[in-house]
Amino acid sequence: MQKSSLLLFLLLLTVVIVHGQRTSAVKPKREKSGFAAIPMINYNRTQGVIVGALVSNYYKLNKKDTISPSSNTGLFGMYTQQKSYAAFAFSRFYIAQDRWRVSAAAGTMDINFQFYLEDPAASTGNFYDYTTKANLLVLQVQRNIFNRIYFGPTASFIKSTTSFAFPGVSGEDSVSVSKLNNIGYIITNDTRDHVQNPTRGMFLNFKNQFYRDWMGSDYKFERYIVSYNQFFKLSKKDDTKVLALRATFNVAAGDVPFEGQTVVGGDDIRGYSQGQFRNDQVYTLQTEYRWNFYKRWGMVAFAGLASAVASFSDIPKSDILPGVGAGIRFKMLPSEKINIGVDAGVGRGDYSITFRIGESFGR
């Protein structure tokens, strides 16, 4: 159960640490470093009111390096009406004319969430509460190996303690203490004109993670994560209209514990916030229309489909989960093209309202 919260937290962490970065697929412009302090307020059905803040600084490691995007270091924290909290520090460095990309993040959290359990004797199920306390460290290094292709190792160290609302849910005790350490590699093909807010190009990412006892993990399985993002500029005159497409799959294989499953929601398919749909494999398709309609103001409209299954062959007979919605944007830090905004999405029997920093489809 704790993996659902951990995945949501790692997703948020991943989105934050890439803010404001730009690839060198097109001729770069010199930009001044910038400091951003962005407050956050949000609401969803499981956490109630959420408040927080992001403090981040953008800078050049080498002022003579006009090719590397701005490096980024910051802090993020949040607290919710359900007494959940999360805090972490992060850095992402672009080194030696963008030949090296290094990122690191460390954080702690205490999340009160829920999971959905079907009743075999009935046609419906029930939600049950649980609490996860966790500390984590994420490291990643990539080297440019050909054109816009990057390759390198990645590792995560996670220790968590989960307390369930009633005994026996974990299969053993009402409290589960576990380590979900992993090591792997990541391959990226990035031709976008801007990482944070692209108008054209492609971002293809493949990550393979191995959970092993020699890494200190309590579980032995593999995870394969693929995300394909494509961006099209719809206007020849300017960059005010963009169409973004995204396809993902998140597959866990082997002796996958319940904690290793993926929850439907987040940027991959907006409109879901209750944690009802989860499985070993989650596949998504999504499209988003972006329109910068007035100076620093913009809007988005999005629609997508998701499927949560035990194996790929189950997709034809599984429930297809739609998600549609729209959002408003404001360019908070023009020098780094960072937008803030709010997205409202509707899914199957669920909805989500999300305050966001940066655009979707950035990982």
Segments from the language model and where they lie:
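Outer-membrane beta-barrel "beta-signal"
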Residues: 184-187, 325-330, 335, 350-363
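Gram-negative/organellar outer-membrane beta-barrel architecture
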Residues: 26-36, 41-179, 339, 345-363
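Bacterial Sec-dependent N-terminal signal peptides
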Residues: 1-25, 232
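Sequence/structural signature of outer-membrane beta-barrel proteins
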Residues: 58-62, 76-82, 109-113, 158-162, ...
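Transmembrane beta-strands of outer-membrane beta-barrel proteins
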Residues: 35-37, 71-75, 101-104, 151-153, ...
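Short loop/turn motifs that connect adjacent beta-strands in outer-membrane beta-barrel proteins
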Residues: 22-33, 61-70, 96-101, 147-148, ...
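Extracellular loop and loop/strand-boundary signature of outer-membrane beta-barrel proteins
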Residues: 75-76, 122-127, 168-174, 211-216, ...
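C-terminal outer-membrane beta-barrel translocator/porin domains of Gram-negative envelope proteins
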Residues: 188, 194-293, 299-302
